[in-house]
């Protein structure tokens, strides 16, 4: 399998809204496998296709301690959220080394297709609920830093642009 390049904030491609997957076929299964390899290599607990410049509604997640329980969500949608919210410290492979508190619904229910194209629903709380909401935001073109104050967003954007220039200068 191939490792994919993860886009870094504030890359405008992170703001593209992903399109639904028409059919779960060999191409989609290869994308899922490559996304999983990329997520585990990073290492991360979730990855949306948007983050690797593939603008289709695909998410891979593994919040297990051993990183051996891959979950695949194709065309995921949140069908229910609890009224109770919880604040979690979030990070993102597209915003490396930056973490901050984001408040989200404490529990959710998601409907999606699995790797075989079969529909399923899952109820989630805790880290899985947070990760699902975070990754589904990516499919809508939203990055977690957009929940932060304009001051924090601007500071993160400036630091990420500076880091990108430094990386280009090292080549």
Swiss-Prot record:
Co-factor binding comment: Binds 1 Fe(2+) ion.
InterPro entries for the chain: Peptide_deformylase (IPR023635), Peptide_deformylase_sf (IPR036821)
Cofactor: Fe(2+)
Cystine pairings recorded for this chain: none
Active site (record annotation): 135
GO molecular-function terms, A-Z: metal ion binding; peptide deformylase activity
Family matches, as Pfam families: Pep_deformylase
Enzyme class per UniProt: hydrolase
Keywords tagged on the record: Hydrolase, Iron, Metal-binding, Protein biosynthesis
Signal sequence range: none
Any one Gene Ontology BP term: co-translational protein modification
Record has Iron as a keyword: yes
Binding site for Fe cation: 92, 134, 138
Enzyme Commission number(s) of this protein: 3.5.1.88
Catalytic function, reaction form: N-terminal N-formyl-L-methionyl-[peptide] + H2O = N-terminal L-methionyl-[peptide] + formate
Family annotation (PANTHER family): PEPTIDE DEFORMYLASE
Family per record: Belongs to the polypeptide deformylase family.
Biological function: Removes the formyl group from the N-terminal Met of newly synthesized proteins. Requires at least a dipeptide for an efficient rate of reaction. N-terminal L-methionine is a prerequisite for activity but the enzyme has broad specificity at other positions.
Official protein name in the record: Peptide deformylase
Taxonomic source organism: Polynucleobacter necessarius subsp. necessarius (strain STIR1)
Gene coding for it: def
